[in-house]
Each structure stands twice: as structure tokens, then as C-alpha cells.
Amino acid sequence: MSAAEKILELPGLRVTVDRVVYQPDAQTPPDRPHCFVYYITIHNDSEATVTIKGRKWVVTNEGGDVTVVEGEGVVGKLPRIDPGEKFSYNSFHLLDTRCAVAEGSYLGVDPNGRKVLTRIPRFEMVVPGGN
């Protein structure tokens, strides 16, 4: 990455993980039977409008196996978040183990074309009541 492509953490752009819910009745593939729905809000308390262009998730299961998921946008959208506004959504992770942690980042761009990043706080996904 060249210096011109430097990605900045924009003060005031932050993410909250509002809720994580285990969905025991979700239809899942046999190799990933545990579904966790997460609810996230991206808050723009900065002075610049930000358009979220992509995301990166790093999910580590209880055995130490790491899965990296990268993609364009957020739930099929490229949300434009004006100063003082927020964008909330929910999605899910499918796990092959009973416990994992997830964290990551969103990549965006400001009106001047500068690339910005905000981190997704680490959160746990644990199947309730199991050994």
C-alpha cells in the first residue's frame, strides 16, 4: 500500500455491538450448526460524512482456528452516514464449535476520498448451557 492509500482511523467514527443472540432453531448446514445473530450500530460522531465500502471479520473458534471474511459493503448496502447519524443492522455468524470470538473493521471513504477505518469491538459467541 502506498502512502497515498493510507487508511486513517477517523476520530468519532465508532462501532457498538448492541446484542448477540444464539439462534438454536435456525436452519444451518451440518458442518456449522451454531447460528449467532449480532446487532451492530456504526455511529458517526465525526465532522465528516462517511460511506462504508467494505468489512473484514476475523472469527476465532475455541480450537484456535481462524476464519477471515472480507466483503463489499454491509448487508448488501454501502451506507452513507452523515455526521451525528448512525447505521444499525443485524447479520449472523455460523460456527462449527460451541464458542468463538469475532472482531474486525469497516472500511469507508470520506467526501475527500480519504480511506477511513473503524474497528468492530471483539465479542464472544457461546452456546448457552453446554460443556
Spell out what each predicted region is.
Residues 42-46:
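Asparagine-centered strand-capping/turn motif at beta-strand->loop junctions
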Residues 5, 94-131:
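Terminal connector regions
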Residues 32-39, 101-103:
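Short, solvent-exposed loop/turn segments enriched in Ser/Thr/Gly
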Residues 48-67, 108:
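Short acidic, flexible loop segments centered on an aromatic residue
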Residues 67-99:
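Intrinsically disordered, low-complexity Pro/Gly/Ser/Thr-rich segments with frequent PxxP/GP/PP motifs
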Residues 5-7, 41, 56-58, 105-107:
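Residue-level detector of beta-strand face positions
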Residues 2-33:
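Low-complexity, acidic Ser/Thr/Pro/Gly-rich terminal tails and inter-domain linkers that flank the onset
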